[in-house]
Amino acid sequence: MKIMHQDSVDFAVNIIGWGMAAKINVLAERFRWLGNWRYSFAAVNSILRLRSQQMNVRIDDEIIECNGLFFMALNTIHTGKGMRMAPHAKLNDGLVDVVMLRQANRLRLLKIFTQIFSGDHVNDPLVEYRQVRNFSIQTKGDALTIDGENYGKTPIDVSVLHKALKLFADL
């Protein structure tokens, strides 16, 4: 994925996250000593400190403005340890899978979180799941996580670079 910032260009292979997704990644880094449980711990901690943000995104040609908790764009099924965030993702299909969570109360969010491990969260009406070729996050100055690194800030414009890399693996 090609990521256009206001004054630079970056690239991502797998994941771009905003909102709660970026906050969870920052917190998980502080709890590396928890091993595989650090992402689950960070997610529960973030749920307890729940705060939605104004989410302004463009997906293909549609503009969505709402209070949201997170936005993630993924090329593969998994994020964190065993979380099936994008259960229909394929690395080589030329699309990025977008998962958006609109504002929810803590109890509903806990329910959705437990469904992420099976991929069933995409059936919740507060979760929007799409496969797209490009998107933008139009908020200003919000932190991002890019391929597991806490890096960059919004706004960004992202486009899929289909077949830009040659992988030597069966997909």
Per-segment meaning from a language model:
Residues 1-69, 73:
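Catalytic core of DAGKc-family lipid kinases
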Residues 11-13, 43, 55, 74-76, ...:
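N-terminal hydrophobic or amphipathic segments with adjacent small-residue motifs
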Residues 17, 21, 72-86, 150:
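Glycine-rich phosphate/pyrophosphate-binding beta-alpha loops
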Residues 21-24, 65-67, 79-82, 106-109:
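Short acidic/glycine-rich loop or secondary-structure boundary segments that cap or lie
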Residues 33-38, 87-107:
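Gly/Ser/Thr-rich active-site loops/lids in small-molecule metabolic enzymes
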Residues 43, 57-59, 83-85, 121-124:
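A generic local structural motif
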Residues 51-53, 67-69, 92-97, 131-133:
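A generic structural signal for short beta-strands and their flanking turns/coil linkers
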Residues 59, 63-65, 90, 100-171:
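ATP/nucleoside-binding phosphotransfer catalytic cores, i.e., glycine-rich phosphate-binding loops
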